[in-house]
Amino acid sequence: MKPLQILFALLLLPFMAVGQTIKSPNGKVAVTFSLSASGQPTYEMTFKNRQVVKPSHLGLELAKDKHASKGLQETDLMDGFKITDTKISTFDETWKPVWGQYKQIRNHYNELAVSLHQASSNRTIIIRFRVYDEGMGLRYEFPQQSSLNYFIIKEEHTQFAMTGDHKAWWLPGDYDTQEQETQETKLSEIRECFKKAVNWDNSSVSVFSPTGVQTSLQLKTQDGLYLNIHEAACVNYATMHLNLDDKNFVFESWLTPDATGLKGFMQTPCSTPWRTVMVSDDARDILASNLILNLNEPCKLQDTSWIHPVKYCGVWWEMIVGKSSWNYTDEFPSIKLDQIDWSKAKPNGRHAANTEHVKKYIDFAAANGLQQVLVEGWNVGWEDWANRWKDYVFDFVTPYPDFDIKALNDYAHSKGVKLMMHHETSSSVGNYERHLNAAFDLMQKYGYDAVKGGYVGDIIPRGDHHFSQEMNNHYLYIVKEAAKRHIMVNAHEATRPTGLCRTYPNLIGNESARGTEYEAFGGSKPDHTVVLPFTRLQGGPMDYTPGILETQLHTWSENTSYVHTTLVGQLALYLVMWGPIQMAADLPENYQKYADAFQFIKDVAVDWDDSRYLEAEPGDYITVARKAKGTDNWFVGGKCDENGHRSVVKLDFLDKGKKYECTLYADAPGADYEKNPKAYRITKRIVKKGDVLTIDEARGGGFAMSLIKK
């Protein structure tokens, strides 16, 4: 080495000495932590020696508050740090989820914990990195200390500096809704596409920046790397969005504020959620990853024997389409619950949740092996429930006059079926919490063990947002209280999941995205369900409510919308849009019209011992095989976008030397989600391990397959 080179290396030593690299167990993912010259925490990330995240800053900006910070003038945790300790460790366990895609999950990572001290404020924080074979998670931790006890977060400044103008599958950043259609653009095109991307007609919309996007964010680099940015274990903290510097392609965390405009009220000891980056050169690895679940705490429920998968039906779809109604009467322009004599109200004749009608659904469920019947609109208050910012909307215990709650539950139980409770809150959160004990008492009295919740409209307390710290605490409070009563929760319009179903597995479903209901409101693009598994489903399963076999709604209603899949494409969703709670959402009479196709919905499992992603490309196609829990039977589903797809299914996952009866539900020649959606064919054959099936999926179509071991 020349003298000049030696001198230059020596000059760099003070900076280089603070750097620390931690690699994944397989050595392919590497994260390097360092401090800048000003003492600002910085990290970068590589995959197979290719840069994935360029040097990115870390830190938090605190709000000045004489009560929370005791008058301290230093109001940030951004720079001025020195490393006081680093700890490297390895963790490797295998755990068994109560339900999910896999019978058991390996949690294997290498960890770097960096202790940092800020001399100007005498504060200490820890930044912890966990590096997995498929990515990494980082979080901030705040030990208890006299100089940092209570504090308020003004902004979190966690950066994700991209290496180029990647392709992105994104939703507009919004404090209140994820019910938007995914956009597929380059990062540089987000700004120009943003306004048109927003569903301004949603019941609650609060965008914050023309380059703001939601997580989980799926990306693809020009050289073929797949990246995914999300968060895990969001507890007592606001939901994270991302704001893009579209000149430098740097994302920065953007937290949801509460009604005060502030973003987090903290008390040490505490920590933030994990900020996650997944990476692979194979899109299938993103779908198969358990990184988000692994970053959550283990199950906190001692007894989980009462938690079970659910396949259900209900009156929901006929109301969504407009044939029936939630409300019992049209007599009142507005109502006050304690001033209405419902026995004297004039029925409108369209109320779906009436005793005789619900009995038909119970009979249908019993005859077809469905465990539960969801009944929305059973309780008084639906006459003026939505978009009023009304506090006392529902009491959650009083049925309409035509809904005999005791008789219906008795009838259902006699048939081996249960009713599923519905608690729409109209986002009046305080009202729901005031009535929660009485509502759960009623459920236990009549034998309900599952509830679908809802949060349509703007939040009360007024000015708050669906994804704020306080609202996230509310959602978790409901799940915890339900667990005490052995009640499973399926939350709609709540915050997007971040893997908390591992810790509280009675959270068996979430909506938190644009679901099947939008097919009655003009439809979602055919690529919608081959994007969501890369984005929304990263944090947990979705109650997507598939199974609409009569895709042309005008055949049985006055609704002119149509479902943007083929009939067989709907069957595929039971595999692609996985979850332990699945709805057979169509009307019983429509299933009778297509009884041979409905057989797959009856047969398909909703809980799994194993899952194999066979083909995948975001926004184009997904093919997945799943092994039904406790059996040797497999089910395979393939779904594609509006361009169609030729799927090559290699049956390598079957047991060697065994034969399987294969029933294939496929798009027929000429099938098309717009022109010929109900053209399908069903074929049977005997197959074995190593066989290869080539299946053509129509535009907006797919296929479904059962493989029953002989």
Report residues per predicted region:
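Solvent-exposed beta-strand/loop surfaces of large extracellular or lumenal domains
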Residues: 91, 101-103, 170-178, 183, ...
